[in-house]
């Protein structure tokens, strides 16, 4: 690391700043897991974002290990692996049996199966610089697919004319993170680090523009099933869009779920429900909505 700071002082500075920003983003879900711990329940939250974040961190550590002078990528993604593993462990402790089974299968499929296959193919079918090229494009492809996830949140903001699903502070911090890591990749002449962050910056600017456009608008009332349709997701355990969660934007999970659970608009019944019958259907709809919006967040870790 000392050699890097002497040869690329600006790259070291941007890499260090990127480490700080990304580390703070990793810690963003802490309030969510504090709620899970206090309530002894996962409350409809998904494990998908954390499994994908762990997979991304593993990929970038492997990539950094194949190169020289990539200590800054190793440090932040190592921290990410530890933090995401803790999140997943806590989730497994308090999740219902069905969610535990789904999370275990997802871990085996993605973090063991897919990562193991990538490791095996790059070691057996390529060597030297070619191995770095192959793995670099794998990392770029994964990062780009993850950055597509914010499209559902952007569409939801446009439909509802409400920015409560998209906090400005989060969009701003993620945009700054993309700029910092782009400059880091540019200065060390690593296109695999720089390229994905161009897309990340673009989505960040779009989100901040939408925030400026709709922050004073009167929100439209959106029913639970409309939110689900806008995010194009399924139930808690089988959300298709959840697989596209981003590594760095996982913080949106807590904010989006809090908003949906506290500000959901319910349909008005003509007849008042019996006092003794709790509105369990509404509770189920709220949980499904929370999972749907959580599955549409964006995240990309330290790259």
From Swiss-Prot:
Residues 31-44, 94-105, 155-167, 214-303 are cytoplasmic. The chain crosses the membrane at residues 10-30, 45-65, 73-93, 106-126, 134-154, 168-188, 193-213. Residues 13-98, 134-217 form the MtN3/slv domain. InterPro entries: SWEET, SWEET_rpt. Residues 266-290 are annotated as: Disordered. GO terms for molecular function: sucrose transmembrane transporter activity; sugar transmembrane transporter activity. Mediates both low-affinity uptake and efflux of sugar across the plasma membrane. Belongs to the SWEET sugar transporter family. PANTHER family: BIDIRECTIONAL SUGAR TRANSPORTER SWEET14, RAG1-ACTIVATING PROTEIN 1. This is Bidirectional sugar transporter SWEET14.
């Amino acid at each position: 690391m000392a050699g890097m700071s002497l040869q690329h002082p600006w790259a070291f500075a941007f890499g260090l700043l990127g480490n700080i920003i990304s580390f703070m983003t990793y810690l963003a879900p802490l309030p969510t897991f504090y709620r899970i711990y206090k309530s002894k329940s996962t409350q409809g939250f998904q494990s998908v974002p954390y499994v994908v974040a762990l997979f991304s961190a593993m990929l970038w550590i492997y990539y950094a290990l194949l190169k020289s002078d990539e200590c800054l990528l190793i440090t932040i993604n190592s921290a990410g692996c530890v933090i995401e593993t803790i999140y997943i462990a806590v989730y497994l402790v308090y999740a219902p049996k069905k969610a535990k089974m789904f999370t275990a299968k997802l871990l085996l499929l993605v973090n063991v199966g897919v990562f193991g296959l990538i490791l095996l193919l790059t070691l057996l079918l390529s060597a030297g610089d070619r191995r770095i090229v192959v793995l670099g494009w794998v990392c770029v492809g994964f990062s780009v697919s993850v950055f597509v996830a914010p499209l559902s949140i952007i569409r939801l903001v446009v439909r509802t004319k409400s920015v409560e699903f998209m906090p400005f502070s989060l969009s701003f911090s993620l945009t700054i993170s993309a700029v910092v890591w782009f400059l880091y990749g540019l200065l060390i002449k690593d296109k695999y680090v720089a390229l994905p962050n161009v897309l990340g910056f673009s989505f960040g600017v779009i989100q901040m523009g939408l925030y400026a456009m709709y922050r004073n608008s009167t929100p439209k009332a959106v029913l639970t099933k409309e939110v689900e349709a806008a995010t194009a997701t399924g139930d808690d355990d089988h959300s298709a869009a959840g697989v596209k969660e981003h590594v760095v934007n996982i913080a949106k999970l807590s904010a989006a779920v809090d908003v949906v659970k506290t500000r959901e608009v319910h349909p008005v019944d003509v007849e008042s429900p019996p006092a003794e019958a709790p509105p369990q259907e509404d509770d189920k709809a709220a949980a499904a909505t929370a999972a749907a919006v959580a599955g549409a967040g964006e995240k990309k870790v330290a790259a």
